Amino acid sequence: MNDIGGKKDNTINPETLHLLRNSTILTDSDWEKFKTLFNLSYNNFLDEIANKIPGLTQAEMRYIALKKLRISTRDMAKITGVGENAIRSVKSRLLKKLPDYDKLF
């Protein structure tokens, strides 16, 4: 997993970064639009993650993307329309699944 990382935030167009950080991901359509823009901005980061770590849920993929954008748990909950406890549960599952969790970010 060491070769996964994508671009750093400071190399991404500020307008695109703003758009990603202020997205709302409530529907599958919202997620697809967000994922497309995110992958374009971060060198197919999410696609690479999905290929290298099969079996990740959509919620886990969303968490990874939002965490990479340095979004807080509270804001992740608002963006995805779930409670903060749901976000914490996703993080907990990821920590169990991925021994190299911190290297993703």
Give the label of every model feature segment:
Residues 1-26:
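N-terminal regulatory/sensing modules of transcriptional regulators
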Residues 19-20, 24-105:
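Cytosolic nucleotide-binding catalytic cores of signal-transduction proteins
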